[in-house]
Each structure stands twice: as structure tokens, then as C-alpha cells.
């Protein structure tokens, strides 16, 4: 073995660790092709890609960030994954290949998180970012009372997974950490859901009282008691307050009376008209295109994937001829760049078909508004008609990616 190889990888590591995994491994292969480890690295690279494709094909919902380099006469396997199965398969594969290696792989969550591996959102809306810093891109948002799984910690930020499986970072001020027993107690407790677009939790049973916090559409709090006009509620951090009954429901009762339909999809969607566009927004304070469709379906009793490029993978394909004739109210329309011989299809936008004679759909772009696919209508949307990719139907369709709130939700 080339004695300079370990030093070479140490010096090179800082530059190439930031590359995507496949480029990182390709770089290793190219630079080791003249030594005895090149065949070994190629085999490991192939094995790594197979496992990643099986367990973490989408890094937004799964973690498999594993790297390989050399330390002395042994290969060092480092990084992290949130899949114990992926880790075990990786280790077994390396042993089967009779590769001596140093195991420095973290299986999340681990001791960095401790026994409080769960959390509940404690603010009206929590901002969940792509990296552990306040200046990072907004990836998604969580609503008050939302259940979260904690995977990792870095500084004042926690890497969390939301019920739709999305993984990003939230600051410690937005969540109440819990151990498993506390988390189960919260989830099993009687709840109150807020059903108006925006409002307040009051300090006393008077609408002119001081406020404990604001609250937005879909927010959940623990039920304590009630009188004729207010529910007394408790936050995950034990604060208490009062919500107007006219703006909320007992969550269990709300779920039971839900009857998702084309009309209810349209009703909820139109209640959000004029809401501002916010990249990564998933609340009534602001929403992007897929955050809008996600909120509409949430208030109809379903958790759907977070991003448009994920939402297109759920449901039943409709409108094969791309002429809008077989669409029904409530179907999701997807837009973007069509596939070519060189590039895959790229989904960048989504809206909801309204099924009227104006050929209208409602979507978040600038703000939430209606547009038309009919060139004779004043709100004709030529740009989106030209980049229309197809549609999916969610209502009355069984799909592993569409979670019914009436079912037991696992984190």
C-alpha cells in the first residue's frame, strides 16, 4: 500500500467532503486508480450506492451520509444514518467482502440526543431549516402541537423528523423535548384543534384578556376544561390558556365529523386565497405551492408529502392526455420541466384543480390565487399551461404516501 495515501486523504478530505456522496466516491476512485486499493474502493462504492438507493433514495426523508477513507492499513467508515437496517447491512457487506475497517458510523438518534428523543412544537409555527443556523434556508414549518422525532443535536438546533418524514433543523426555542413516556402521554391526551386561519390563546376566559400566544390553522393543544364559550388548554411546556369555542373543536370530534370531498377541498383552499407566498412556508402565516396543497389536505384529514416533487409520487395518475378533460375537483396539477434524453423530469410547482367551466386551479405563487387553463379567461396562466406535467388524484385513493389522520401515526 502507498504509505502517502493516508496523508493524501487527510489533506484532500476538507475539499471533497462537501461534494455529494457519489462525487466523493468517484474522486476517491480516480485518485486511487494507480494503487492496490482502487478495486477495493470501487467495490465499496458500488455496495454503498446499492444500500443508499434501498434505504435512503430521498435525503429529505432519510439519512444515509456515510463516507470511506483510509487510516493506516484499515478503511475508516464514518458518517451517520437514521436507519439501523441500512447500518447493519453496510457492516455485514463489508465483513462479507473481508474488508478490515474502523466503524465510526453513528446510528441516529444516539447518545448525542439522550433519552428525550421526541418533541412537540410549542410555538404557533416553528421554522424548520435546511441547516442548524437561523440564516439557513427554510425547509418547512411545523404547527403548534405537532409531534416530532429528534435525530441529532448541533449547538442550539435539533435535527427533527416531522410526521410526513421530512428531516431538517429547528431551534430549541420552538420545541418541548420529551422522553417516550411523556410523548405518549401527550399524544394520548384529549386535544383541541384551532380551525380558523389565525387567532389567539388568551390568559383568562375573556376575549379582551392578555394573550399567551397566537395560534394558526391546525394548531393543537391539550384539553383541560371548558365553559360555555372557552376551552381551557395546556401547551406542551405546561403553559395554560383559553381558546374560543367558536374558533376550535375537540380534536377527536373534528376528526370524526370530517367528510373529505371535492367540495371540502375547494372550501378549505378558497379560505386561503390571498395568503402570502413564503418559500418553505407550511402554515397560514405564509406558504409555498406545496405547503398550500399540504395545508388544504391536512384540514381535510390527510398528511401528504411535503414537496411538489414528492407529492407527484403519491396518489393515482390522471389526465394521461394532458388535456384536462378527465380531471376532477381536488386533483393536484404538477408543473415543471419535462424529461429529455439527457435529464429527468423536474417538478417545480403544484396547484389544485377546481373543476369549473372556467378551467380554473388554485395555487400559491406570489400569493394564493386562482388561475385558468382557458386562454379566453382573464386569469389565463400561459406559463403554467406550457409547463404542465400531469396530475394526481388523492381523494378516495389508497397510497402509502397519503396518511389518514384517523389512523395511528408512527414517528
Annotate each predicted stretch with a short phrase:
Residues 304-370:
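...with weaker cross-activation on analogous glycine-rich loops/strands in unrelated enzymes
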Amino acid at each position: 500500500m502507498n504509505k502517502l495515501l493516508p496523508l493524501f486523504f487527510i489533506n484532500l478530505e476538507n475539499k471533497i467532503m462537501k461534494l455529494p456522496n457519489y462525487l466523493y466516491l468517484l474522486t476517491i476512485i480516480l485518485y486511487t486508480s494507480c494503487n492496490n486499493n482502487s478495486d477495493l474502493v470501487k467495490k465499496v462504492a458500488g455496495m454503498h450506492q446499492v444500500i443508499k438507493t434501498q434505504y435512503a433514495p430521498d435525503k429529505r426523508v432519510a439519512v444515509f451520509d456515510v463516507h470511506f477513507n483510509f487510516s493506516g492499513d484499515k478503511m475508516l467508515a464514518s458518517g451517520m444514518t437514521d436507519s439501523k437496517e441500512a447500518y447493519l447491512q453496510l457492516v455485514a457487506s463489508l465483513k462479507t467482502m473481508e474488508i478490515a475497517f474502523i466503524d465510526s458510523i453513528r446510528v441516529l438518534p444516539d447518545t448525542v440526543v439522550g433519552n428525550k428523543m421526541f418533541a412537540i412544537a410549542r410555538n404557533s409555527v416553528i421554522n424548520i431549516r435546511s441547516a442548524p443556523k437561523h440564516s439557513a434556508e427554510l425547509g418547512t414549518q411545523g404547527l403548534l402541537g405537532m409531534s416530532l422525532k429528534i435525530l441529532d443535536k448541533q449547538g442550539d438546533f435539533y435535527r427533527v423528523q416531522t410526521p410526513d418524514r421530512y428531516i431538517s433543523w429547528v431551534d430549541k426555542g420552538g420545541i418541548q423535548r420529551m422522553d417516550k413516556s411523556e410523548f405518549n402521554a401527550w399524544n394520548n391526551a384529549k386535544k383541541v384543534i384551532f380551525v380558523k386561519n389565525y387567532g389567539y390563546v388568551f390568559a383568562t376566559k375573556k376575549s379582551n384578556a392578555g394573550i399567551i400566544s397566537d395560534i394558526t390553522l391546525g394548531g393543537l393543544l391539550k384539553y383541560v376544561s371548558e365553559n360555555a364559550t372557552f376551552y381551557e388548554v395546556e401547551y406542551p411546556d405546561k403553559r395554560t390558556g383559553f381558546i374560543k369555542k367558536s374558533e376550535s373543536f375537540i380534536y377527536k370530534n373534528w376528526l370524526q365529523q370530517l367528510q373529505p370531498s371535492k367540495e371540502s377541498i375547494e372550501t378549505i383552499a378558497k379560505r386561503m386565497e390571498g395568503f402570502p407566498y413564503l418559500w418553505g412556508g407550511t402554515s397560514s402565516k405564509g406558504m409555498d405551492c406545496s405547503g398550500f396543497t399540504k395545508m388544504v389536505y391536512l384540514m381535510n384529514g390527510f398528511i401528504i408529502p411535503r414537496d411538489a416533487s414528492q407529492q407527484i409520487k403519491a396518489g393515482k395518475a390522471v389526465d394521461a392526455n394532458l388535456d384536462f378533460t378527465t380531471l376532477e375537483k381536488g386533483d393536484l396539477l404538477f408543473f415543471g420541466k419535462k424529461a429529455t434524453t439527457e435529464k429527468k423530469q423536474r417538478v417545480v410547482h403544484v396547484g389544485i384543480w377546481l373543476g369549473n367551466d372556467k378551467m380554473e386551479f388554485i395555487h400559491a405563487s406570489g400569493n394564493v390565487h386562482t388561475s385558468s387553463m382557458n386562454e379566453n379567461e382573464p386569469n389565463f396562466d400561459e406559463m403554467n399551461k406550457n409547463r404542465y406535467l400531469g396530475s394526481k388524484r388523492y381523494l378516495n385513493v389508497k397510497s402509502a404516501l397519503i396518511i389518514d389522520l384517523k389512523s395511528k401515526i408512527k414517528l
